[in-house]
């Protein structure tokens, strides 16, 4: 059914696509985070900063942790996941907006954490997200799998729920702007395979 979808390990040359897809997966949150670095002269634009971050060799959540889905001759989606080790306990949030997510992550040390799973809008609904999710579950190598999504992201909540993920905890999101829509961050987990 999804034989038209090919998965491959990302390479450094995919950094631009990874930045775009990570931003899509985060519904613009990644761009907001990268904006501060652009304002400080690290890059000209937030997207350029995202590309630089995704091209780093040693950074968790960069190209080395990413799997690309291709369909119909183009990059269609990405999943970025890694083992969440004890080192997360030493990380402190540097801005209030990341504190709730970091606190949730600290409760699932030892799991395989999916930091991003995104598919271009015109290619959604044909199994690409499911295929990327299945691949991440396989990469977990019998560890529990965890992820965080927004409480108002119904498509993501549905996909994860249909694939054995259960809500483990919630934390109110810190609004990015005064008029931002209110939501919570939802930690979802799936038992070890």
Describe the residue ranges of each PLM region:
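C-terminal "cap" of GNAT-fold acetyltransferases
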Residues: 143-154, 161-163, 170-193
């Amino acid at each position: 059914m999804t034989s038209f979808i090919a998965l491959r390990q990302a390479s450094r040359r995919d950094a631009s696509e990874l930045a775009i897809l990570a931003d899509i997966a985060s519904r613009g949150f990644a761009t907001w985070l990268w904006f501060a670095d652009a304002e400080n002269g690290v890059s000209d634009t937030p997207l350029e900063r995202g590309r630089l971050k995704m091209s780093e060799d040693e950074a968790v959540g960069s190209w080395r942790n990413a799997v690309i889905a291709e369909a119909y001759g183009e990059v269609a989606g990405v999943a970025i996941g890694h083992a969440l080790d004890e080192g997360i306990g030493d990380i402190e949030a540097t801005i209030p907006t990341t504190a709730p997510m970091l606190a949730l992550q600290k409760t699932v040390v030892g799991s395989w954490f999916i930091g991003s799973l995104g598919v271009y809008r015109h290619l959604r609904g044909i199994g690409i997200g499911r295929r990327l999710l299945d691949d991440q579950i396989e990469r977990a190598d019998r560890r529990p799998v965890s992820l965080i999504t927004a409480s108002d992201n119904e498509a993501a909540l549905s996909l994860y729920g249909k694939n054995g993920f259960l809500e483990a905890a919630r934390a109110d999101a810190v609004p990015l702007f005064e008029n931002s829509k209110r939501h919570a961050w939802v930690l979802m987990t799936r038992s070890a395979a």
